Amino acid sequence: MALFHNLEPKRSIDFMSGARTSSGSPSVSYSNSLPSPHTALVAPLSKMQRALWFDYISAPESTMYNLTLKFKLDQESEEYDGSISAILRAIDFLTKRHGMLRSTFHNSSNPSQPPYFAEIDSRHAHPTTHIVSSSEQLKRAALRGFDLSVDGPIRWIVFTNVKSNELYAVAHHIAVDGSSMSQLSKEIITLLTHYKHQSAEMLAPTTTSNYGLYCLAQDSYTHQESYKKALHFWSSQIAGTLPMEWNSSMLRTNPARLTQTTSQLDHRVCSTWLSLTPQELKAWGNLYKTSWFRVATALIGLLCAKHSKHKFRTDQSLLVAFGARPEQSNDVLGHFANGMPIKIPISMLERSESAQLGGFVKEVSKNISAAKREEMFPYVDLVQHARRNGLNSEHRVSVTFSPKLASDICSLYPVEGVCDLFFCFLEEEDGGAILGLIYDPQLFTPDAIQTLREDFIQLIRFSLSPEDATQSLASFPGLSARQQFNGPPLHDVVAIDQCRVHALVQQQATLRPEQLALYSEELQMYMTYEELEMATNQAAHCLRACGSCKGEVVALHLSHGFDMIIWIYAAFKSGAAFTVVDPSYPPTRKSAIFELSKAKICVYDSKTAPSLQWAIDENLCSVFITTAGSDNTPIDRFPTHPLTDEGSTLDDLAYIIFTSGSTGLPKGVMVAHRQLSHFVSAARDCTPVGPSVRALQVLSFSFDAAVLEYAATLVYGGTLCFAEHRDALVGDYLADVVDANKINHLTATPSILATLPAAREMPTLRSICVGGEHCPEGVLNTWRQRVQLIHAYGPTETTVAVTLHRLPREIDPEEVADGVSPSSIMGKPLPNVKIYVCDTSRRILKNGKIGELHISGPQVSRGYIDREELNAEKFWINEHGERTYASGDRGRILPDGTVLLYGRINNREIKVRGYRLELGEIEKMITKADTQVRTVSVQANVTGDGLLAFVTPRTVDTEALRLALAKYAPRYMIPSEILAIDALPCTVNDKVDHARVQRDMADLRARASKLGTASLLTPNDTPLQSPSPPLSDISQLDLTDDLEWAAAKARIAEIWRQVLAAPGPILGGVKFFEAGGNSLLVLKLKAEIEGAFGVKVSFSDLFQNSTVDSQVGLVQSRRGSSGSPRTVRSHARPQRKAKTPPRQARPETPESDYDQLPDLRDDVQQSICSIWMEVLGYHGKLDAKSNFFELGGTSLQIPILHKALLREFPASNVSLVKVFQSATLAAQVELLGRFTESPRFSPRPAITPSAAVVSRSPRRPSSPAREQYAIVGMSGRFPGASTIPEFWDLLVHQRDGIQAIGGLEDAPLGPNEVLVQRRGLIKDVEHFDHEFWKMPKNYALRMDPQKRHFLNVALEALDDAGIELDPQGQNDVGIFVGSSENTFREYCATRSEDAFEMRHSHHMDTAVSATAAYYLNTFGPNVTLNTACSSALVALKLGMDALATGQTKVVCVGGCTIEYPLQGYITEPGKVLSTTGEVRPFDAASDGSVPGDAVCAVIIKRATDALADGDQIYAFVDGAAVGSDGHLDKPGITVPSPRGQAETIKRAMQQAHARPEQIAHVEVHGSGTRMGDALELEGLSIAYDQHLGRQAGQRPVSVGSNKGNFGNCEAASGLVSIIKAALSISNGVVPPLRKLETVGDHVDFMRLNLTPAREPLRLSRHDKVGVTSLGLGGSTAHVVLSAPPGNARRTKEWKQIRELHPTLLPCGPAN
């Protein structure tokens, strides 16, 4: 075409620059001078200005943000006056007209206030003007930075010449943007024209508005709902993007980014690329039906994609400048431009091989259109949000458009900026544009920039014609799609037929062996592709050894987890197919699956073994394999190399999925390997999964949609992630799992998706595939705006899905015909799949007609196993000769091939929560379960998430029916309501009229309610009542809480009844799911329980405690630990207020020769185990020695246990006392076994390979209910370290912070005394910025330095925690400080002028915490205490209690010790203070301690609050305890007691729910005294061995002390240890002791099973760390810490107040 023939630039773009140094110019610095006394207006900087401010103050001498406007003025012009006098006159007028040109910029003296600008009164404003006559003078004047606090933001330069003058307006970008410069050009031309002719319209002396009003309006905007909506949009623009990483071919050999502190400042180079005429720009825009700038932005995105790296299915973003100027500010000069990131959808290359340039441009244009509506949102706020949530906050390429200037005598020199590449379009006067590129020459060579230019010109020409607009993106050189896997092309049906999914996964193991294949953050487990390949090979060899081969079926009766994946692929590799037998199915359902599938091998695990025992007894399979392992045939004895392929055919079976069937038996759908391969191959363009993408396994493996999760994810090279509790994957728990595992993609049914809280950020989640049932339009609209939503449709019989429709973020009216609901749009068929609409005679209808959907193609399955008649009915050959499946779904096809779905044709087959159900099958099960039932009608309930059954006659016991039905039907097939009525409506043929039942459900329910129905009772149970067990023979049991227990039980039972819509009361032994519950109803149950009892429970809590009884215990324990005023007592014995009773001895267990349980498979054993688990709410491992009380049982639970045992073993009639005395499992089996005739299990030999899962760290045990606390901020001053980084560095490098100091030289010494002139000192201890705290100087001089320094470190710690205090509001922060005595008072040289205050200074001295609360403006509790060296840990415990009881939401815990006078000390050998001036804990040379000073603070929150707030966490505090030694085993008050200390450690460990083997390290008090160290370690060993039952042979616990580094910091010492422990957890390593040469004989580490920390100790994620602090006199404290979740770990850097305020006032005795 004629356009775009010559793209060479008509003129050059340049900017006023050399390097960013001003070679001959005076250096510029920011002086932060005060505003002029003639200031007329003060306003905070706008958010856009603040983003530039941070760059400015770091390098005020830089010219990177200088924006220059040039005028070339002819002095002889007839159009305007170009004289110097006219120029100066115009400058003066504009300075008075525009407040921004006469403003100065300043940092606030209050760090909580933003920087501001001060507008000088126009009467006192004087512009900065230079008149120069040489180029050198011009360069010196122009190439300088700004001192914005003095000079203002603009510098005028007049370059004189004979016939012309040049005017330069050099402005800082913080004050003006490109549109303001355009406005300024117009106003200067207007003024000069007016001065020439006195006829042009003169400008008004002031503007209609001012920039200050805009700043205030912007601040107001940040508090509006529209701001939150905009944040949501902008988050979507950076979600799923990564910073651009340039290809190495583009970069210099050693690219360097010079900082602005070097002598050669960072600078940029400008390259003018091309010119575009108005006609060319118009044609460009018309071709793509959008603006030319949007087309250009899209092409720049493609250009950058070609020359950069990016991960699979990730996008990139460009900063695009938006005007963001309000209409009322049109004539105001200021910085309105807002550069914001626009997503460039590079992932389109992977989403579709046929992705077209036109579609790509359209996506970018949509993003820009939406961005224009939200252009007011500040970029700096988005960056902060991105950093908090782990999103991309780094943008290296910018695109901008500067509108045309007033005349061709004007030129604009753009800013250089800080981007790697800055594409700048300047509008020409004729409407054309010039493109220039400003780039970083330290990164790119000129040749690389030339390559970019050539490629961009090629892209422009590539985009010219309509034919090119429809070309594939991949056809452009360098933009080929990144493939998930090396599978055949989609058109090669034969090649896909030959593929095998397990072979494709094997390809990934070859390509990326170290890539994560399987992962679980909760379980702390993962497997790489290489490890998965090896494990599946071993399991395949095992199957082959057991007889597995082609044609066989392996039944997988496994828990949801890694094992299921291993054995699925092992079955494939062995040549067999697999079928999943869900462990939750009833025996009759499992029996049907075993029988229909003809499985000869069954694989199970230890968790699922109990529910499979009957099948083993009945020999339902030839071979049973357990993953639990045995010494005979462990799986790791099998080879890791692949099996030899026995040869395969096209129709080899891959798996059998069982669905509901109308005959009363499940239907087994047989899917062959080639059908599975076709689905996985066809889904590649629609499923956003690939290398480095994390997908969550949400669905049950018995549900065919799970294939999309485990097959597609692993074939495409992604990472498949698992939750610990799959059944609980709804609501907040699902969101928690997404965040913890950093999930990018998940598959869910609409029922599950509807529970996912849309208010949660979930920053890593990029896409969701939803299907399995009808999805409400509201759910689609909610999530399509947040993520890429994929709407899936496909019957099980056609292999998972036949359409995968990617929904646009907003409904496009052009794409949706009138009257079409978005929820009915399923999209177009997958490649090689055909969908037809047929009438009842199976004639294919034209598009647009409604009928039954029929599906053909290579994904159509083999059919149903052993159901020939049904196969003939559902699978047929259509008129085109294609094998076709009749789906039973009603729909139509639009002209473009889009499939619309309108539901089922047969309303007796429905979908509930993703499961396809034949209602007739359930009705047959009901009649089989109870022969009294004459007629039955099962319907979907009103909400569509459950079933409702009506039965006749009204005398049917509905609860007995439900219990009987549980023997035949899976949980999801059991109606949540069964209502008995007198009659059901019938047809003329005397059959139940199900349509009328559906229509009249409300009336039938009302009739059933009037008639009444049976309650939810177990067969041997009685209705709920207050328990009243006989007490005559158990007087030793305290049952005073029974009435309260019964009240709580009755309340929870009523909640269940309401949630389940049950007709009668519910008893404690019924499980929630057996009573008709499901995972969706758990949401309602959770809300009701939390509302009724005022406690917080998690989804996993409710899944683990699934009966009324266990939930009562859960609620009781939560209320007991929460300190709530509405306390409901737990099972535990209430504390008596009278004399403390003696410890109750454990009842002795009668001797028994039954000392070992053979695999817990005996009926008696299994029954008792189940009862224990239900009563205790315990789900761990049980063995013969398991003790009821040691597992958490109490005397109050014995009557419950006794009652349950009598129900199970009614013939035994054992007394409650006997049960009480038989405390172990073995004893109760022995006690009750004699009353049971069932023989003990005698299993035949089974192959039992060991677990194949490779775990890098052991599984973390699931935590019982407990409160944890998070350390989210810290700061401190320590000997030898003034910041936290310095503190850590000193510890890591084992340096000594104790230093030499003078003093006491003239003090008299006793016979054995020595003067030691060493001490742990704080640097600059006497310096304090009183002005910063707005404190009178004289008052500050008298203030205890402990208070001064605590003010600073408390504020720094709060800042480190991201907590900004409101100086005008009520800050809900509590302050708890352990502090030493104020010794400064006596040495203070400055006295108060108030005589009364001087006389009573001891009484008038405010506490450290009170002083901090005043100056920090906090309103929470404040406490200062002194328990000697344990003070800070005691303060920590009080702070935790304040959080637990709701007194405050944030606590600042402090420790302070600064002792005056600052001098050495006098001591003598054998005393507590060292004669050598060195602290050496545990060393043979240790001789005491050395005094040390420290002031430090940590910020703690409740862990749940910290995680919800997105805080970065150093460590969790799991438990803490304080105690006293008493006097019974102490020779004196100053001697520590090991037993007193052990008691405190025990209580802290119990509160933390920690076991000794979990403790990797303990930071002990370790004062360096021989006796003190020995007694302390003795106490630690007593706690672990005698109180907590540490087993022999466990790893020795590491012990360390920081006293060798800092000395004994007295009241602060415990918090110093906490900070060290928290940093150790955060960094994953414990620093070693400073100095340990020879272990002293006073410490027997081997006997104590402890080890000194000689070397750095690596910590794993599950390791815990203890901290002990011992106060003189017997006040002891112990704390247990652990690691937070990986996504909450601390990553940000520390800031210190002294870095922000370096000018410090000396305050001390010397002054």
From Swiss-Prot:
InterPro entries: AA_adenyl_dom, ACP-like_sf, AMP-bd_C_sf, AMP-binding_CS, AMP-dep_synth/lig_dom, ANL_N_sf, CAT-like_dom_sf, Condensatn
Biased composition range(s): Polar residues: 1114-1127
PTM-bearing positions, type O-(pantetheine 4'-phosphoryl)serine: S1079, S1195
Domain Ketosynthase family 3 (KS3): 1266-1683
Entry keyword Transferase: yes
Chain positions covered by the region annotation Condensation (C) domain: 43-397
Span list, region Adenylation (A) domain: 506-907
Alphabetically ordered keywords of this record: Ligase, Multifunctional enzyme, Phosphopantetheine, Phosphoprotein, Transferase, Virulence
MF terms in GO: 2,3-dihydroxybenzoate-serine ligase activity; 3-oxoacyl-[acyl-carrier-protein] synthase activity; phosphopantetheine binding
Domain notes: TAS1 has the following domain architecture: C-A-T-T-KS. The N-terminal NRPS module contains the condensation (C), adenylation (A), and thiolation (T) domains and catalyzes the formation of the amide linkage between the isoleucine (Ile) with acetoacetyl-CoA. The ketosynthase (KS) domain and this domain in the PKS portion of TAS1 is indispensable for TAS1 activity by conducting the final cyclization step for tenuazonic acid release.
PANTHER family: FATTY ACID SYNTHASE, NONRIBOSOMAL PEPTIDE SYNTHETASE
NCBIfam families, per database record: AA-adenyl-dom (TIGR01733)
Family per similarity comment: In the N-terminal section; belongs to the NRP synthetase family.
Function: Hybrid PKS-NRPS synthetase that mediates the biosynthesis of the toxin tenuazonic acid (TeA), an inhibitor of protein biosynthesis on ribosomes by suppressing the release of new protein. TAS1 alone is sufficient for TeA synthesis via the condensation of isoleucine (Ile) with acetoacetyl-CoA by the N-terminal NRPS module and subsequent cyclization conducted by the C-terminal KS domain.
Protein name (Swiss-Prot/TrEMBL): Hybrid PKS-NRPS synthetase TAS1
Organism: Botryobasidium botryosum (strain FD-172 SS1)
Gene designation: TAS1
